[in-house]
Amino acid sequence: APEDSQSHQVSLSKQPASQAGGDPTGPKESKKKVESETETDPVP
């Protein structure tokens, strides 16, 4: 039972951080990087 509880807690702790902190900043920064790369090095 304790292992199940720990696993659940880790999943719960990991999900919010990924969705609240990584999700909004991830895609946004990723898009910016891709745009910057495309602008600096346009595809032939």
Curated annotation (Swiss-Prot):
It is found in: Host nucleus, Host nucleolus; Host cytoplasm; Secreted. GO terms for cellular component: extracellular region; host cell cytoplasm; host cell nucleolus. One of its GO terms (molecular function) is RNA binding. Acetylation by EP300, CREBBP, GCN5L2/GCN5 and PCAF regulates the transactivation activity of Tat. Residues 7-18 have a biased composition (Polar residues). This virus is cytopathically active and was harvested from the brain tissue of a neurological AIDS patient. The transactivation domain mediates the interaction with CCNT1, GCN5L2, and MDM2. The Arg-rich RNA-binding region binds the TAR RNA. This region also mediates the nuclear localization through direct binding to KPNB1 and is involved in Tat's transfer across cell membranes (protein transduction). The same region is required for the interaction with EP300, PCAF, EIF2AK2 and KDR. This is Protein Tat.
